Design a protein with these regions (language model features):
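RecA-like P-loop NTPase motor core of helicase/translocase proteins
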Residues: 1-222
Length: 222
């Protein structure tokens, strides 16, 4: 039986609009690429003292201010006829300069190609801003497998749109911390697919510093 090949239309305007709306949130961000940081991951068998791998990790770097992101968000909402938000979520004091999370919701109708849009959005962010680390958080194993297949199915098509740039991906496994270490060090466009349970596992547990080091969950650290 012959293999099935999917044909993707790269010019669906509603999909391009969704990608542009997301990328425009960071308008003004230079192509600064990645910032370095220290990485410590347990690679032993989880018994005794354990073995820790120390390395330099690379992460996406956002240099524009939260206020600029808010202005970009309001412009994107106004363009779509939505009521502009007055603050980012979560809201922080005006004098806060420290890095902080920002949550955005992008809504699309069922059957409009949401997976295609967010996979292509990651590539567009890489092309414009140099960002190369992305997480896809899924609620179930079935959806995780579907995402993996979508990454395979769209690979050739998206490479053709983005100068042959490959996109590496893997499924997070707490028993294989070296894979996460490689992801953190890698400067290539990379995606980690992770079940939401990997975050929930430790989120409700109070850790001492030593317990945090030894936690089997290296994604979430208090």
């Amino acid at each position: 039986m012959s293999d099935v090949t999917f044909q993707f239309d790269p010019k669906q305007q509603f999909q391009l609009d969704a990608i542009d709306a997301t990328v425009s949130l960071f308008s003004g961000q230079p192509r600064s690429g990645q910032a370095g940081g220290n990485l410590s991951i347990e690679v032993g068998g989880g018994t005794g003292e354990g073995l820790y791998q120390h390395a330099l990790g690379l992460g996406n770097q956002l240099t524009i201010s939260r206020n600029q992101v808010l202005k970009n968000l309001q412009a994107a909402q106004d363009k779509q006829g939505l009521m502009p938000d007055s603050s980012l979520i979560p809201a922080l004091p005006d004098d806060t300069d420290a890095p902080a999370p920002m949550n955005f919701t992008i809504s699309m109708e069922t059957g409009t190609g949401k997976t295609y849009v967010y996979l292509r959005t990651m590539r567009q962010m890489h092309a414009e801003f140099g960002w190369s680390k992305f997480f896809i958080v899924v609620p179930s194993v079935a959806i995780r497998e579907g995402v993996k297949q979508s990454l395979r199915d769209t690979d050739k098509h998206l490479r053709e749109l983005y100068n042959g740039e490959p996109m590496d991906f893997f499924v997070y496994d707490g028993k294989k911390p070296t894979e996460l270490a490689a992801f953190a060090r890698n400067s290539c466009l990379s995606v980690c697919i992770i079940n939401i349970q990997a975050f929930i596992k430790d989120a409700d547990v109070d850790h001492t510093m030593e317990e945090a080091k030894r936690s089997g969950n290296v994604i979430y650290k208090p």
